[in-house]
Amino acid sequence: MRKVKVAILGSGNIGTDLMIKLGRSPILELTSMIGIDPDSDGLRRAKAAGYYVFDGGLQPFLESGAELADIVFDATSAKAHILHAKALREAGKFAIDLTPAAVGPYVVPSVNLGAHLNETNINLITCGGQATIPIVHAIGSVSPVSYAEIVATISSKSAGPGTRSNIDEFTETTAQGIEAIGGAKKGKAIIILNPAEPPILMRDTVYAVVDEGADRQAIVKAIHQTVAYIQSYVPGYRLRSEPIFDENKITVFFEVEGAGNYLPTYSGNLDIMTATAVKVAEEYAKYVVGIGTSM
């Protein structure tokens, strides 16, 4: 099977971790890393690994020729992606947006990836969205969810400048994803940066309100099936306890431990984004090559 060529836009923590994960993919061939800081660790590592390096931003990469990549991962910022999206679309690239910009449709692999493989730009929502929306959707597959609230708690050390500058976009985009993809009638998202030492793992809580008399056994089964699917590409994703029921309210506690490729294991919030991005790209690559997908 031929590999599909990809490039990374953004040489920060997320882009660098993505570079390591892509190096192990049997389907994707990383060719290039694009950034704006020639002294960044990401660009230095990319150069040492033999990839093409562009330190003048997206335009020099696009001017170099179309053959370098069919897929471009954007790991910059929400504001930057709005500009990048237009240029990538005009160049005929499939863009996987790891920022909260949401230019393209929201995608959560366990819920709706198969519906968007013919798009030119898809959005991975946020780390909190990738962690929690599948749980909301699992609950909603059994009983309508009238309200869902998620709380994503991450280590302060895992929140770099990009994360901190995108806080407002994080809460807005995640809440929209809870409703649009999770299926909740009303959604709310909260992010907490915890300065504890040693740094904590990413911890998430989902609160959901369902119909009276909803089938609890079926809800628990749906949650466990969803967790197992996510673990196929994010092994550190796990429940911290069994779902808790209080009349028609459900509380689910879980955590995400990173794989430790480039980022520390406590940076599960970043790891779930890079692992999800690779999963989406591999499914898209199967689609364009014509061998079918697992979706």
UniProtKB/Swiss-Prot annotation:
GO terms for molecular function: acetaldehyde dehydrogenase (acetylating) activity; NAD binding. Pfam families: AcetDehyd-dimer, Semialdhyde_dh. It comes from the Bacteria. It is an enzyme of class 1 (oxidoreductase). SUPFAM superfamilies: Glyceraldehyde-3-phosphate dehydrogenase-like, C-terminal domain, NAD(P)-binding Rossmann-fold domains. Its EC number is 1.2.1.10. NAD(+) binds at residues 11-14, 158-166, 269. Keywords: Aromatic hydrocarbons catabolism, NAD, Oxidoreductase. The active site is at 127 (acyl-thioester intermediate). Gene3D superfamilies: Dihydrodipicolinate Reductase, domain 2, NAD(P)-binding Rossmann-like Domain. GO terms for biological process: catabolic process. It catalyses: acetaldehyde + NAD(+) + CoA = acetyl-CoA + NADH + H(+). Belongs to the acetaldehyde dehydrogenase family. This is Acetaldehyde dehydrogenase. It comes from Brevibacillus brevis (strain 47 / JCM 6285 / NBRC 100599). The lineage of its organism: Bacteria, Bacillati, Bacillota, Bacilli, Bacillales.
